[in-house]
């Protein structure tokens, strides 16, 4: 999973204008980087200009996906990722970046400008590009799911380690005093049913 670019654009008026961006071009060859960067800017300006206020859309192109979020204030965020990057964290990140940009730079600063300047940059954009390469950083639900998956892995390893010490689950079931006779019978019947489908 990879984020290649985060861009903030003004999409009110005749043509969209990139106000600031952060790009990670490390996976591209040295001589390709300038062209790739220009294409990302072109892509961002094109899709921002064609996305209505309040709309979100994801555009797939080859191995890349452009996630676009256009706000009613005339501001638009474009996140270019690979196909594996999840959609929900992408839009969570775009929403966060656009909120912070509007706090740092009210619309009066950028609404009527002809070209961008360094004063319109968002200093945290490079940090976000690095931090949110891991989508669980952007999405707390995804982070909780990842923690649950890790806990499940630990539980599986614990059960496997008990069984690897020479104990068999059948013996444990037979010795268990906490299982009723019907539970033991159910376990044995389920084991027989499942074993009939195995190819030896």
Swiss-Prot record:
Pfam families, per this entry? Answer: Longin, Synaptobrevin
KW rRNA-binding (keyword) present: no
Q: Cysteine methyl ester is carried by which residues?
A: 197
Which terms are listed as keywords in the entry? Answer: Cell membrane, Coiled coil, Lipoprotein, Membrane, Methylation, Palmitate, Prenylation
- Specify the propeptide location in this chain: 198-200
Domain spans labelled v-SNARE coiled-coil homology: 140-200
**Which residues are the lipid attachment points (S-farnesyl cysteine)?**
197
Which PROSITE patterns does the UniProt record give? LONGIN, SYNAPTOBREVIN, V_SNARE
Q: What is this protein called?
A: Synaptobrevin homolog YKT6
Organism classification, top ranks? Eukaryota, Fungi, Dikarya, Ascomycota, Saccharomycotina
Which gene name does the record give? YKT6
């Amino acid at each position: 999973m990879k984020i290649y670019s985060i861009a903030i654009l003004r999409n009110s008026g005749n043509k969209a204008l990139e106000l600031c961006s952060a790009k990670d071009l490390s996976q591209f060859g040295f001589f390709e980087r300038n062209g790739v960067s220009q294409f990302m800017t072109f892509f961002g300006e094109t899709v921002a200009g064609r996305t209505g206020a309040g709309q979100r859309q994801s555009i797939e192109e080859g191995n890349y996906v452009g996630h676009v979020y256009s706000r009613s204030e005339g501001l638009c965020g474009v996140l270019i990722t690979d196909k594996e990057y999840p959609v929900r964290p992408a839009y969570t990140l775009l929403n966060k970046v656009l909120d912070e940009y509007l706090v740092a730079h009210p619309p009066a600063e950028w609404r009527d400008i002809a070209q961008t300047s360094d004063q319109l940059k968002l200093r945290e954009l490079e940090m976000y590009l690095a931090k949110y390469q891991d989508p669980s950083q952007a999405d707390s639900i995804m982070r909780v799911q990842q923690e649950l998956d890790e806990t499940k892995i630990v539980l599986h390893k614990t059960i496997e380690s008990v069984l690897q010490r020479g104990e068999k689950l059948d013996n444990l079931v037979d010795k268990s005093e906490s299982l009723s006779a019907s539970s033991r019978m159910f376990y044995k019947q389920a084991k027989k049913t499942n074993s009939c489908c195995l190819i030896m």
